[in-house]
């Protein structure tokens, strides 16, 4: 599966548009990650606990999008975009959303 944020694939020809594909996931840090992340917020520096949660969420959302594209018979996804938002309150989670256009290329 070829993935790109560009609208085209250079010399590769798009021969069929399959449609919009999406991936969404909400991740919350574990208790340990929450405690370590909270301490890091107090003392400053890179917050690897929360960074890892965000990276994992992005990978899972992307894989969900890829799975949808494969089900449609696509072999590439173009115009990929990512978005995220923080869920406050008692969940303290991060929502990661990605989307793109599933296509067949030659």
From Swiss-Prot:
What is one Pfam family matched by this protein? YbjQ_1
This protein's superkingdom? Bacteria
Output the InterPro entries linked to this UniProt entry: UPF0145_dom_sf, UPF0145_YbjQ-like
**Similarity comment: family membership:** Belongs to the UPF0145 family.
- PANTHER family on file: UPF0145 PROTEIN SCO3412 (PTHR34068:SF2), UPF0145 PROTEIN YBJQ (PTHR34068)
Q: What is this protein called?
A: UPF0145 protein Fphi_1781
Q: Which organism is it from?
A: Francisella philomiragia subsp. philomiragia (strain ATCC 25017 / CCUG 19701 / FSC 153 / O#319-036)
